[in-house]
């Protein structure tokens, strides 16, 4: 071992100074990752969680919480005297999103590559053969997230791989634990970790968390990690943890006058704002990317809705400075596409911009994010911190900028200051957008919309979804719909016309452009051919209705609404039959889902009950009615069971 390495490990704040000391292979991993010393949350957590104590950790975003629980969990599993029994789970890590669960899993896999016995088993995770048995303790992880694999496939992998640590989202974890093949007795199970606990509850996973806790022994170690402790999280702590030690890691900074103020973000992160009209936001983004020194390798731009992300991902390719690639990530993407896009962004070799919603605002530890831009301020001010925290992680310098429209929105700065999240006007790099810059950007976007009807329609949907999101903003005194400049907003989106919305009633929907939007074609030839055929059919039906009205016929025969009212009873009965068939299909689907959620013993008991009820009903149907009995026996009554009432 080189002398320099020994001296580095003995530095008071280094990893080697921790007591009890970390295993050499763990130190090798930390050194290879460039982590010279533990962060405050890691040091505080190691002192307690490595012992036999539950912990509740509240720490700012980007403070290194992932390693704060992964290292103690792995150490605990490897301290076992004997290898885990087959199909016995020793640890579970719960994450609110697929992306975060996948990231934790990947960090753990890279970590275990430095532990030779565990690294030897990692290739079996992707094979079809059972992993070999071991005579020494190892860590074998399995990732459980919905969308990418089916529950049956996860169970098959579990039976083949026999992992002792599960990492996943609440729904899929609860589903796997409900099977009789997965065992977590008190003799085997060691530790439970709930990461981003506040987010778990915000997303409505309380029922799944209750189910998971019910499957696990009460005698266990539990770690709860969160950026904030709400009342709901406090209730979860009461139910799921036993005499926990609370660890709160704060960041403090000096304000004017030497006043010490707590911060909820790392000191390495600069948080700023710019005041700009909506029409100038995209040009301002371009200037930030172009003028920031050094040039940002990875940037994240947050929008308020999925449709906005989808739209701007289509139109910004010709707007952003040369050399920047665009990747989109939002909740309406298929899980496989989301995972692929996330990997593209993380592994990008050239400057890349991620356009996303709040799906990427929590927990994701994306390396080397230099710039975060909030095109739309979040509807929940708590999310603001988490968005900013994607940059400036683990001591790396980062810049986070939020764009505010002139007027009442500038009050957002004071609101954040009250909530211990001070932001300052952006001074560097300088951003100075002119009206000509805004006109040029909108004209380029509009040219794309005029060339492809798909972009035109997507722009309309994106704008409507943004308006709905703005209306639902929690800070209604600051974000007021009545104060919006709709024409300027439309220019920022590059709209060819305002969509039909109650909020823009009475305004010139054409925006003074006088564009015949009906003539805009689809770039896809097949879609355009279908559109033209439907348009021609609509024109014929319209002409027929007008001709019938002119002749005094009233147009009932061709008007779809009136035709429905005057429909023959036979036709209505046919519709009722179709509806009844659909209801029956839905009932069977619900029943199948209910049976699928049962354990094997529960399904066996349900089958026996169904058979008994069917037999009783069959006998009841074959038995004579009371009237027939009376006629046949002269009114003599019997005590024969006549079945259940339906």
Curated annotation (Swiss-Prot):
It is found in: Nucleus, Nucleolus. One of its GO terms (biological process) is assembly of large subunit precursor of preribosome. Residues 582-591 have a biased composition (Basic residues). Residues 539-646 are annotated as: Disordered. This is ATP-dependent rRNA helicase SPB4. A motif (DEAD box) lies at residues 195-198. One of its GO terms (molecular function) is RNA helicase activity. It comes from Chaetomium globosum (strain ATCC 6205 / CBS 148.51 / DSM 1962 / NBRC 6347 / NRRL 1970) (Soil fungus). Its main location: nucleus. Residues 622-631 have a biased composition (Low complexity).
């Amino acid at each position: 071992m080189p002398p320099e390495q020994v001296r580095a490990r003995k530095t008071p704040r280094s990893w080697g100074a921790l007591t009890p000391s970390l295993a050499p292979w763990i130190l090798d991993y930390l050194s290879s990752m460039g982590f010279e010393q533990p962060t405050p949350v890691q040091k505080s957590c190691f002192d307690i969680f490595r012992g036999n104590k539950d912990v509740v950790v509240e720490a700012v975003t980007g403070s290194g919480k992932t390693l704060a629980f992964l290292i103690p969990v792995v150490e605990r599993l490897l301290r076992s005297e004997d290898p885990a029994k087959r199909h016995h789970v020793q640890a579970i890590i719960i994450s609110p999103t697929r992306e975060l669960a996948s990231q934790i899993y990947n960090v753990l896999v890279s970590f275990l590559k430095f532990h030779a016995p565990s690294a030897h088993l990692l290739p079996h995770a992707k094979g079809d053969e059972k992993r070999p048995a071991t005579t020494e303790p190892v860590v074998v992880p399995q990732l459980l997230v919905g969308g990418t694999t089916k529950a049956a496939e996860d169970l098959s992998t579990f039976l083949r791989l026999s992992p002792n640590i599960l990492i996943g989202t609440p729904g899929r974890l609860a589903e796997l634990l409900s099977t009789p093949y997965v065992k977590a007795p008190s003799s085997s199970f060691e530790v439970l970790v709930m990461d981003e606990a506040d987010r778990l509850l915000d997303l409505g996973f309380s029922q799944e968390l209750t189910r998971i806790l019910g499957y696990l022994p009460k005698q266990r170690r539990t770690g709860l990690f969160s950026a904030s402790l709400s009342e709901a999280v406090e209730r979860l702590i009461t139910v799921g943890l036993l005499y926990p030690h609370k660890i709160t890691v704060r960041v403090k900074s000096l304000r004017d006058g030497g006043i010490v103020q707590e911060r909820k973000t790392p000191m390495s992160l600069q948080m700023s704002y710019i005041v700009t009209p909506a029409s100038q936001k995209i040009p301002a983004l371009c200037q930030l990317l172009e003028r920031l020194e050094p040039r940002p390798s990875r940037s994240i731009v947050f929008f308020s809705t999925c449709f906005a992300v989808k739209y701007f991902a289509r139109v910004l390719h010709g707007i952003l400075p040369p050399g920047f690639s665009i990747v989109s990530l939002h909740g309406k993407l298929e899980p496989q596409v989301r995972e692929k896009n996330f990997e593209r962004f993380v592994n990008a070799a050239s400057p890349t911009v991620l356009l996303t919603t709040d799906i990427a605002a929590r927990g994701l530890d994306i390396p080397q994010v230099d710039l975060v831009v909030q095109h739309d301020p979040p509807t929940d001010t708590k999310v603001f911190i988490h968005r900013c925290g994607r940059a400036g992680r683990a001591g790396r310098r980062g810049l986070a900028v939020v764009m505010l429209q002139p007027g009442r929105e500038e009050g957002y700065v004071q609101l954040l200051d009250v909530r211990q999240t001070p932001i300052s006007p952006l001074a560097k790099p300088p951003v100075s957008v002119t009206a000509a810059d805004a006109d040029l950007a909108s004209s380029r976007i509009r040219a794309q919309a005029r060339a492809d009807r798909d972009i035109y329609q997507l722009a309309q949907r994106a704008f409507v979804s943004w308006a709905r999101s703005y209306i639902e903003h929690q800070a209604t005194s600051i974000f007021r719909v009545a104060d919006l400049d709709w024409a300027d907003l439309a220019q920022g989106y590059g709209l060819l016309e305002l969509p039909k919305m109650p909020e823009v009633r009475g305004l010139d929907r054409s925006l003074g452009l006088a564009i015949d939007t009906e003539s805009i074609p689809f770039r896809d030839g097949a879609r355009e051919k279908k559109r033209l055929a439907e348009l021609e059919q609509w024109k014929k039906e319209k002409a027929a209705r007008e001709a019938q009205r002119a002749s005094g016929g009233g147009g009932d025969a061709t008007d779809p609404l009136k035709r429905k009212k005057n429909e023959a009873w036979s036709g209505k009965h046919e519709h009722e039959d179709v509806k009844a068939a659909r209801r029956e299909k839905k009932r069977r689907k619900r029943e199948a889902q209910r049976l699928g959620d049962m354990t094997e013993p529960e399904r066996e008991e349900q089958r026996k009950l169904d058979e008994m009820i069917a037999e009783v009903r069959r006998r009841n149907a074959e038995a004579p009615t009371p009237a027939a009995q009376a006629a046949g026996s002269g009114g003599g009554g019997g005590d024969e069971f006549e079945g259940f009432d339906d």
